[in-house]
């Protein structure tokens, strides 16, 4: 969990896409993130990015590692709302959000990762999709429509305006989908492509290309139990 390589790439980047989990960069590494945020540049957070970092160390006085998800993406780690590794997630468009350019060409998304609990979004956040808990990890499994956990469904994708450590405003997009196996779904890939285009000021096409660049054979998410890994 200690250290994070390659953060110097943020110095010239237009967009940060983050999917880390409970990392603890050293002070030199963290400064690249702080400088990026202070420039007001956009951020895309995938699934575990709500708890991307851990510890009381700080990016700045107003932003500790533990606070990154809540302050920059709008949410922190809360819970597994669905049964982990048993129930999946199916996207449902939030009423009033269908006109968002980020949803252009995005059909129903199925994510084998379970629905996360999301409880800290505010009226200033824009929910685009909610996640319905499904009976199993099979893409054809039924939505548990009568399950109280789907009343209401938890947010699955949203837009957030963050305040950087130096007070500058920036924009972020977050989805609690995004485990490796989730990206088998073309519509999830298109959602992320659309968000990247939108947040960097581009015009989102009616149906962005979201094909794999190289063959993609994801392994199911789990911890690696090998000693010393």
Predicted regions and their residues:
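Short, flexible, glycine/charge-rich loop motifs used to bind or transfer phosphoryl groups or to couple energy/partner
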Residues: 5-8, 99, 116-118, 163
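Short, solvent-exposed loop/turn segments at secondary-structure boundaries
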Residues: 22, 57, 184-187
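Helical hinge/lid and interdomain linker segments adjacent to catalytic or ligand-binding clefts
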Residues: 1-52
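An acidic, glycine-rich "communication" segment
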Residues: 46-141, 148, 208-229
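Extracellular ligand-binding/catalytic regions of CAZymes and related secreted enzymes
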Residues: 135-229
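Structural recognition of the beta-strand scaffold that forms the well-ordered cores
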Residues: 14-19, 37, 42-47, 93-94, ...
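Stable alpha-helical elements in mature extracytoplasmic
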Residues: 9, 29-33, 98-102, 188-192
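Extracellular/periplasmic catalytic domains that process cell-envelope and extracellular macromolecules
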Residues: 8-12, 37-39, 120-122, 149-152, ...
């Amino acid at each position: 969990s200690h250290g994070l390589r390659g953060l110097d790439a943020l110095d010239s980047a237009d967009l940060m896409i983050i999917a880390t989990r409970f990392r603890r960069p050293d002070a030199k590494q963290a400064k690249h993130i702080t400088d990026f945020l202070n420039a007001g540049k956009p951020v895309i957070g995938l699934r575990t990015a709500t708890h991307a970092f851990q510890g009381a160390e700080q990016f700045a006085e107003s932003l500790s590692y533990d606070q990154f998800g809540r302050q920059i993406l709008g949410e922190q780690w809360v819970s597994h709302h669905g049964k982990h590794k048993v129930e999946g997630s199916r996207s449902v468009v939030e009423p009033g959000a269908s006109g968002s350019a980020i949803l252009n060409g995005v059909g129903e998304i199925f994510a084998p990762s379970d629905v996360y609990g999301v409880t800290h979004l505010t009226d200033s956040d824009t929910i685009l999709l909610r996640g319905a808990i499904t009976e199993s990890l099979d893409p054809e499994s039924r939505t548990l429509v009568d399950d109280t956990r789907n009343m209401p469904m938890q947010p699955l994708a949203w837009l957030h305006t963050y305040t950087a450590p130096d007070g500058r405003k920036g924009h972020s997009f977050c989805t609690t989908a995004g485990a490796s196996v989730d990206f088998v779904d073309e519509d999830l890939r298109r959602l992320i492509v659309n968000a990247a285009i939108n947040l960097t000021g581009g015009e989102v096409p009616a149906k962005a290309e979201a094909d794999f660049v190289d063959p993609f054979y994801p392994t199911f998410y789990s911890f690696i139990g090998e000693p010393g890994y």
